[in-house]
């Protein structure tokens, strides 16, 4: 199948790292210099809505790069190189190459080679953590993440303020909270960051509206739940789309799911 230019870039960069492919008996079945003679047939299937703010590009491109790396037996020339390649397909795909808590480092080099993802804590660090995903709409959004970010970069003063003064301190706070399993702080930071992201969208000219009325109801329900418990137990976050991810601990998952099902029953329920 035909893939876009960003996918072609990932494929080209992985080919550069290709090594001999060896079978289980140690026999070389493809020499690294022979890979140039091979074409790649790619089939990508996503069980989640695509282009709806649920990180379909991150998941797809991370899977794409990871699979290619295994196929070509690619060997990194420096730690994190595969995440740098995934970043060229989709920025957030770099973070999706690992589980757990992952930081995408901005980097300082002109060629972007040090803009890589780094795993801060693996997926086993906080086993009680859960994510309740609320699919508000499976329709593709009107404004893509890429075009939206570019418009915000050009027109939103709030984005510059966020980049200059908010991001780095907040990242450090969130990492500390996650490593300490401090859900109260983690949840507050998560929700505040989501709020600011969508404030930037509205500060953009013309404004971008990713959330809808159902999204706002999810926020209100999380606030009601948190008020009831007198602490943060349901931490919402919205990416570039109307669909919600609610972080919570295992003990509170049944209540959160019951509340959401009560207000948003499944068709036919």
What spans do the regions from the language model cover?
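ATP-binding N-lobe of GHMP and related small-molecule kinases
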Residues: 1-52, 66-79
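Active-site nucleophile and cofactor-binding loops and adjacent substrate-binding regions
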Residues: 54-56
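C-terminal nucleotide
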Residues: 121-269
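Short alpha-helical patches at coil-to-helix transitions and adjacent helical residues
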Residues: 4, 58-65, 215
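Fold-level recognition of mixed alpha/beta catalytic cores in primary-metabolism enzymes, strongest
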Residues: 59-63, 74-76, 85-150
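Short coil/turn connectors at secondary-structure junctions
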Residues: 36-40, 77-80, 98-99, 128-130, ...
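Short, well-structured alpha-helical segments that form the helix of a local strand-helix-strand
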Residues: 79-90, 184-193
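Short, hydrophobic/aliphatic alpha-helical segments
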Residues: 36-47, 86, 217-229
């Amino acid at each position: 199948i035909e893939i876009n230019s960003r996918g072609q870039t990932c494929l080209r960069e992985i080919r550069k790292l290709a090594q001999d492919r060896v079978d289980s008996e140690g026999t070389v079945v493809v020499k690294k210099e022979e890979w140039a003679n091979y074409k790649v047939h790619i089939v990508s299937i996503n069980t989640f809505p695509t282009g709806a703010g649920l990180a379909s590009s991150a998941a797809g491109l991370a899977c794409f790069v990871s699979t290619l790396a295994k196929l070509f037996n690619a060997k990194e020339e420096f730690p994190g190189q595969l995440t740098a390649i995934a970043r060229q397909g989709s920025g957030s795909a770099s973070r999706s190459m690992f589980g757990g808590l992952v930081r995408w480092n901005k980097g300082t080099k002109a060629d972007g080679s040090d803009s890589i993802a780094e795993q801060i804590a693996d997926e086993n660090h906080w086993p009680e953590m859960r994510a309740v995903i609320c699919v508000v709409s499976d329709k593709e959004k009107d404004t893509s993440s890429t075009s939206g970010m570019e418009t915000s970069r050009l027109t939103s003063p709030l984005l510059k303020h966020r980049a200059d003064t908010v991001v780095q301190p907040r990242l450090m706070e969130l990492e500390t909270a996650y490593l300490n399993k401090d859900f109260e702080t983690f949840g507050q930071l998560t929700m505040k960051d989501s709020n600011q992201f969508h404030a930037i969208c509205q500060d953009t000219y013309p404004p971008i509206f990713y959330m809808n009325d159902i999204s706002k109801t999810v926020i209100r329900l999380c606030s009601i739940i948190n008020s009831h418990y007198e602490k943060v137990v349901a931490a919402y976050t919205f990416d570039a789309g109307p669909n919600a991810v609610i972080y919570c601990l295992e003990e509170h998952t049944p209540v959160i799911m019951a509340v959401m099902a009560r207000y948003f029953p499944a068709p036919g329920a």
